[in-house]
């Protein structure tokens, strides 16, 4: 962006001037500078000057649209500019700046718009501008062709498109119509698309050159000399100046992206989207097939279970039938009466045999001496009667054998008398029986 050099002392205008974005951080800093709630205008002016100087040091060329160019009057003075001053501005350009060339935009082509440099900035920022090519609009594109016929205003504001917009708000609306372009080192594609859309929709359009349909090559100052910016039209070729560089460098730094490249990129994005949709559709069909197979497998498993149950039932029936046949073959050819008589005789024989065995055992036991018990089994204790009862307590005997030890006898007596008869006095309570 460029500043128009005026003989009057330069002042930073506290308004929403158009500053091309040099990135996200630069835009945020510009928004902080143009804070409408700030009360100290001198501080904001100093911040604005420092911000613009920082942009210049980084290699960018900021353009400040003065209030006279936007509104038709000066914000520093109350008196509007005279007609002679306006004519002097339009007729006599500054000596330090290069002559402005009108650029014609042919149908279906977009080109870079050149920016004139002021004399003060042409010395310090030419080396940095060789790296960062600017894509700012000319101030002449914002002015009408008939500046002499207009009374005080130089930009035709479309009031019918924006009803109810006051003059103080018109600058922001114009900036919305003209989308600010980014530098080509950041995003050339986005800048070309936004320029094409903004020039197609906005009522403010670039003037066309009179007479010659071919656009003149705009020139740009670099450290090596003048360099012509290429503008491609139907059948136009590359032009070279005195200090031109190679064709590849000119195409990379100066030529803008045409609509064919934009269309090719759009077609590529559409193709990618179609492929993505196709892949999604394939995955959906695969999932549907898997679900259908699972549904088909469930009835097959149920049929197999039913067949296994039928086979089991048949096997059980066969076993029952075989048992019934075996029972029938055993009782074939024998009357029922004979079976009952035989069974009765057998029962009688068994009963007589058991009686004889018992008698033999009793006779044998009489001749033998009685067997001694191996253990002294204590009898269960009687129920303890209270003091009110007059029934005497029955005596209990403890049978002692040679095999019984002293501890066993003591345990038996303890169970009967409920007294601890051990030689050692135990202080712990007795265990329940």
From Swiss-Prot:
Residues 216-230, 288-306 have a biased composition (Basic residues). Residues 260-330 form a coiled coil. InterPro entries: Ccdc71/71L. It holds the Pfam family CCDC71L. Keywords: Coiled coil, Phosphoprotein. Residues 204-256, 284-310, 325-396 are annotated as: Disordered. The modification Phosphoserine is found at residue 125. This is Coiled-coil domain-containing protein 71. It comes from Mus musculus (Mouse).
């Amino acid at each position: 962006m460029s500043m128009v050099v005026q003989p009057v002392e330069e002042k930073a205008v506290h308004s929403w001037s158009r500053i091309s974005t040099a990135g996200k951080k630069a835009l945020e800093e510009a928004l902080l500078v143009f804070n409408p709630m700030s009360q100290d205008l001198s501080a904001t002016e100093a911040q604005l000057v420092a911000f613009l100087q920082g942009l210049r040091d980084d290699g960018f060329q900021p353009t400040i649209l003065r209030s006279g160019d936007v509104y038709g009057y000066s914000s520093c003075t109350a008196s509007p500019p005279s007609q002679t001053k306006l004519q002097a501005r339009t007729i006599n350009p500054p000596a330090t700046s290069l002559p402005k060339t009108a650029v014609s935009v042919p149908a279906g082509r977009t080109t870079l718009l050149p920016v004139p440099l002021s004399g003060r900035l042409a010395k310090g920022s030419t080396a940095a501008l060789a790296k960062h090519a600017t894509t700012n609009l000319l101030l002449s594109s914002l002015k009408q062709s008939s500046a002499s016929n207009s009374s005080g205003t130089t930009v035709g504001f479309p009031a019918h498109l924006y009803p109810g917009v006051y003059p103080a708000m018109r600058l922001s609306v114009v900036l919305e119509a003209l989308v600010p372009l980014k530098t080509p080192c950041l995003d050339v594609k986005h800048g070309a698309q936004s320029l094409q859309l903004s020039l197609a929709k906005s009522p403010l359009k670039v003037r066309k050159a009179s007479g010659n349909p071919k656009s003149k090559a705009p020139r740009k100052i670099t450290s090596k000399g003048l360099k012509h910016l290429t503008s491609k039209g139907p059948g136009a070729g590359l032009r070279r100046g005195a200090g031109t560089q190679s064709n590849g460098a000119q195409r990379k730094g100066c030529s803008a992206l045409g609509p064919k490249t934009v269309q090719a990129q759009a077609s590529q994005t559409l193709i990618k989207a179609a492929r993505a949709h196709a892949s999604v559709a394939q995955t959906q069909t695969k999932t549907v097939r898997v679900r259908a197979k699972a549904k088909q497998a469930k009835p097959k498993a149920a049929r197999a279970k039913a067949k296994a149950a039928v086979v089991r039932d048949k096997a059980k029936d066969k076993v029952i039938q075989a048992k019934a046949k075996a029972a029938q073959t055993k009782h074939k050819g024998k009357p029922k009466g004979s079976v009952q008589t035989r069974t009765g005789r057998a029962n009688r024989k068994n009963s007589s045999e058991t009686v004889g065995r018992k008698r033999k055992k009793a006779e044998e036991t009489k001749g033998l001496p009685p067997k001694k018990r191996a253990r002294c089994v204590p009898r269960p204790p009687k129920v303890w009667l209270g003091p009110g009862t007059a029934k005497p307590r029955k005596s209990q005997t403890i049978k002692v054998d040679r095999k019984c030890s002293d501890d066993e006898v003591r345990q038996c007596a303890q169970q009967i008398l409920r007294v601890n008869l051990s030689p050692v006095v135990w202080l712990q309570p007795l265990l329940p029986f």
